[in-house]
Amino acid sequence: MRRSKSYEVRDPINIWNKYDFAMSGLGKKSKILAKIKHFFKCVKWSKQRITRGYCDCDVWEMFSFLQTLIPDMLQTLKDTRTGSPGYLGENYTNENGILVNDTCHEEWNCILDKMIFLWREAEKDTCSQKNPFDEAHSKAMDEFTERFGLFGNELQTEKELEENRKRGGGGTIHFMDELPEYKEISDKYREEEKRLEEYRRKCKDEAIDMIKQYFYDLWD
């Protein structure tokens, strides 16, 4: 599975992605000025990528950057390589009496495919397993927000409002699962998210184990 190129999903590899440009103007008085400033940051980061191989924004979310970069590089290695590790496959004598080993290529392909798959499964946006309750949970959240506000403001009690006034402002946050009509979908969604997080963590661990095993073979 290739990583998404959609507008909603941030692409950590592409410094000039549309998502970051859109977010740069969020909450700013002048969105145009904010986007211009972000443009010059992108120029700076591009120069850093050229001179040292990574830029400042890569470090901010290093795990996400590597989770995207590594499978992309593995895919390129698989697609463009000219050889395979010679210790893979089996040696045999061909019809001309020459000892050869061309079965290593298929075995190396399978190994690379598995590494690519595991790295992509370890990243939420490219993972093949999705939360089946995501749509229902989002719909319930939209309904909750419309009825009670983003942070459940309308559910605040008189006592909470009074305590907040004494503190000088602020508010008490109320969550969707506090209400009986939303508790079931909230619990189902949360439990599935825990399962998916554990699945992605296992994929990450297995992917790293394979990188350790074949680390010195990752060249062409």
Spans of model-derived segments:
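Long, non-globular targeting/processing and low-complexity regions
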Residues: M1-Y214
